[in-house]
Amino acid sequence: MSAPHDGYGQFPPQQPTEQPPYPDQGYANPADAPPPAAGAPHAADHGKKKKRAYAAGAFDVAAGGNAAVGGQVQGGGQFGAPAPGYGGYPQPEAQPATYGAQPAAYGAQPQQPYGMPAPAPAVGYQAPEPYYPSAGAPPVPGDVAGLASGMSAMNLGPGAHQQPQQVPAQGRVGPLNQLYPTDLLNQPFNVSELDLPPPPIILPPNSSVTPSPDANCLPKYVRSTVNAIPTTHSLLKKSKLPLALIIQPYAALHDLDDPVPVVQDQVISRCRRCRSYINPFVTFLDHGHRWRCNMCNLTNDVPQAFDWDAAAQKTVDRWQRHELNHAVVEFVAPQEYMVRPPQPLVYLFLFDVSYAAVSTGLLATSARTILDSLNRIPNADRRTRLGFIAVDSSLHYFSVPKDSDENGETSMLVVSDLDEPFLPVPQELLVPLTECRNSIENFLTKLPEMFANNQNNGSCMGSALRAGHKLISPLGGKIVVLSASLPNVGYGKLEMREDKKLLGTSKENGLLQTANSFYKSFAVECSKNQVSIDMFLFSSQYQDVASLSNLPRYTGGQTWFYPGWNAGRPEDAIKFASEFSDFLSSEIGLEAVLRVRATTGLRMSTFYGNFFNRSSDLCAFPAFPRDQCYVVEVAIDENLTKNVVCLQTAVLHTTCNGERRIRVMTLALPTTTNLADVYASADQCAITTYYSHKAVEKALGSGLDSARDMLQSKVTELLQTFRKELAGGSMGGGLQFPSNLRGLPALFLGLIKHVGLRKSAQIPSDLRSAALCMLSTLPLPLLMQYIYPRLYSLHDMPDNAGYPDPETSQIVLPPPLNLSSERFVPFGLYLIDDGQTQFLWVGRDAVPQLLVDVFGVTDRAQLRVGKGALPELDNDFNERVRAVALKSRDHKAKGVGSIIVPHLYIVREDGEPSLKLWAQTLLVEDRADQGMSYQQWMGTLREKVST
């Protein structure tokens, strides 16, 4: 019998006080509390309290798990009422909230600093004059659209012969970010803080040549670990904070999803000495005929064509040029930027056709997905080429005829000599997609049948890679490996070395390192010839991901791992097909190099990511992916004398449509001599990303223990430094830290307890190695979720959650909860999502009506647990739950490109123990396996800091 709709449970009414409260925070003033999370309704919005279904009885909206972060505050106050701003910063009226007045780089809703009203649109620097008119000139409107009339009044419009002398940037007016210490023990971290934008970048007035709101780089492209740069190496060293850039040049898989301004006229003005590109932070001199480089101070001539439109044969308004208004621009490169004609897009597929690959359905699913994705593979210039090699203990080449060849049949050529595999007919092995479309379709349709009865267990993948490299190295391109077995014959032969007795011991470290030097040396050789490798690995047995992942690591590729994959499970087949199709459709760059230049005194010292470091400051990418980020550590070699420093990232690449381009991203940051300014401007998410890369490097070099110890010692060092230098040395029984870094201990704990790094005797080395690949490549928003997953309470969602927001049309998510079992109630329904896997947790006392509405069953025993999908039922709550689960995996809303489609696992609290345990390992703040709880962690840190 279903329960009536005004209170679905058959239990006595649930009192709000009976639910596990947020750990006592001891806020004397509600203003000191953490902010409401994205999408959380303000207390005042509740009006009359609505009764919720699905609880053990009816209860208030503000009760339950979500009340802790987004509900009403006792006494009628609101979180952050007379609020300090970001992490406690009060925001002066003239002070910008964040670069470019954009919402947080990720998060479902634009986030304001804690409890503050929406600020006026910011422009990336403080209170600029609308323009810099010469004496007696009329003022100019502040918006870019209004510049034209003002320019003509100053004789600066089209046809003007003189540019004005630019007024130099003035000395800093007003303070940088204020430092607001907080007690980590009494005012603990709240997960919603991870959605806040970084501390604002506050530049002196007139720092940029135009008042464009896009003059400074958005954090989704480039973030600094500190948004105020110490002027000396000694001050940076004293702070113990890292100085590094987190760089994600592309925020989407396709240009249409994240367009940037393109300079088409091929007029590229660069500094003669340091080769920086002209940008919004240069200075014009000599009536606009010359410009001073903001990196090295050299004076350069402005190109004559800078103010001339060659196509229209008329002068143009320089102040409208993209490179003076936008921190992120893309230049179409002229001939001198090309060593050879732009390479075409080339995909060479290496299919594992051994018994393991055929029996799991990998070969059939791969071939079908490529067939279905032929229209998605970029081919606008009609030069894209494809090639196919099948691999077991021999190499099977396929010569695909052109469609115009009437009697053409795809022929297979088998080569068994693995020592020096020759190329039978190279010109027919890489064929143009446009000219051979029908033949390729026929071949892919027949391919699974050719090997349907193959019993061969051999895999000569190393030899296949050498043959593939030989085939495509004259052109360059991508080798895509689809393998379900360990390479066990020929070059790069690997042994089964997994030993469960070694897991969790110091000897485990050897399993994470390469077993055969072939993989690194071959990868470097590939990089030199513009060959990139992507690995799609599917084995249910040991596959040595540690060794194979070297191939993508040094060639700008990625390792995708599907443990225990089988096409017989629809969820497995759908996930891979979706991800592989998006992978093929991605508008990658080719033959790319990345370089970061900076103001004199700064030097790029260390680079992290999947590429080959060709020289001290040049990173080489045979292919440039759109779903990875890179970390560059910055050293201060000389004292910085300027108020503002700039760091400019340039990516020279060939688009997959055959155009040579340079993407330039310029970030301007203020300098300071004050340690408090450095701490107040520190970005906890960027710092965590930097240390994630450092921890992976440490794990692969010195072992997992060293990586975990390094993370603990670093966070301890920061707490000690803050106590000694900025908290007066006194702790008063608490643990002082800046409010903008309040999440750092929780994020570091998440890293230490992550599947890639945690101490455990239960984690297969392949799983660990794949996790380390993710920890060192994921874009920052996805990395934060991977380290500290999202937890949503669904049974008591706010009334607007799961519906589109009226203004943005985006699905509203419930406020996220901290990762602790204290958040859970036995009758609850929760979503846990780390970006790779989603768990739908069903409480042991979930009421029948909840089960009916969400799953279409009346009894928990009927619930199909494990990997699955939510049924589509014709009721409002089912639609909302599905909408939340789908929105939680929305990469575009987070400002990133990604192909990942997380699996969904349905977990019953009283169901299968192993599944329940796996889900619980994501509850970072709980004690699990050999990892400590958040309370124990904070106690440990306090002891270390006070000794």
Curated annotation (Swiss-Prot):
Topological type in the membrane: Peripheral membrane protein
Q: Where is the composition biased (Pro residues)?
A: 13-23
UniProt subcellular location: Cytoplasm; Cytoplasmic vesicle, COPII-coated vesicle membrane; Endoplasmic reticulum membrane; Golgi apparatus membrane
Molecular-function GO terms, alphabetical: SNARE binding; zinc ion binding
> Pfam families under this entry?
Gelsolin, Sec23_BS, Sec23_helical, Sec23_trunk, zf-Sec23_Sec24
List GO BP terms, alphabetically: COPII-coated vesicle cargo loading; intracellular protein transport
Q: Which residues form a coiled coil?
A: none
**Amino acids binding Zn(2+):** 271, 274, 293, 296
Q: How does it associate, per the subunit comment? A: The COPII coat is composed of at least 5 proteins: the SEC23/24 complex, the SEC13/31 complex, and the protein SAR1. Golgi apparatus membrane; Peripheral membrane protein; Cytoplasmic side.
Indicate where this protein is primarily found.
Answer: cytoplasm
Give the family this protein belongs to, as stated in its UniProt record: Belongs to the SEC23/SEC24 family. SEC24 subfamily.
Name this polypeptide is given: Protein transport protein SEC24
> What are the entry keywords?
Cytoplasm, Cytoplasmic vesicle, Endoplasmic reticulum, ER-Golgi transport, Golgi apparatus, Membrane, Metal-binding, Protein transport, Transport, Zinc
Query: What is one cellular component GO term in this UniProt entry?
Result: endoplasmic reticulum exit site
Return the annotated region ranges for Disordered: 1-51
Q: Tell me, what does this protein do in biology?
A: Component of the coat protein complex II (COPII) which promotes the formation of transport vesicles from the endoplasmic reticulum (ER). The coat has two main functions, the physical deformation of the endoplasmic reticulum membrane into vesicles and the selection of cargo molecules.
Write out the ranges of the annotated region (Zinc finger-like): 271-296
